[in-house]
């Protein structure tokens, strides 16, 4: 089998393998990014950050920009509706953080974002995509990338949008295989992703959406034509998937899934890092929402999930996970 797990370049930044952790709001903070990195992710992308939050020195926003040692290469994703504001925020990030890459969100489908003329709203207008990327790219020395969807209501502009981004100067493009209207329903549109992969001739293309197994990851490379796979929801509760994909790309061998005990060890490590980042009260509250992902597919999950949802301290969760000595 040909080794698919070779490094690739985003601008002047070398990504050591073909797996990327997608940005996910409320999930891909430094606590989870460091775990994903240790378990094989070649590049990790920060949860989306508001350009206005940076502009107004919002304390919560600035705290989100924290990058731990060992995360690099890492990317910070920005969202916003005004190209001048986005450019100022990108410049601030370049000068004040340890990021290697800046990414622009052109795919978020949630109403709160699109009502503010940001995220997936841009998918309606390739000219605006070009204008915004061209402006932001002009103030940066580090690579600029973009993450988008196949379209707003349909994928008719997918290739045109991608080519506009490429012409404007992005160093890589990631695309989720659903339209904004689909949200997260239905299936990723692999035919459209393939068309985009063929159209982009100067930059790497990252395929995103419905990559839950090593075989699906391989399909995105070999059949869709992507240069790398970007994994979001499937990595929640199973960041070991990055290691499985890397191993499969190198050897063709499928590593077995982790045992329940090993999954709980990762979950516990995730919680401890959240506590270091945000303090016990906030971390435990957030972990209650993350725990169901780690418990997916395990016997007795409902009972344990219910118990964790009532926990309010690290000690309680340690007891429930039976990892008191971890």
Regions found by a protein language model. Name each.
Residues 1-326:
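Flavin-dependent oxidoreductase catalytic cores
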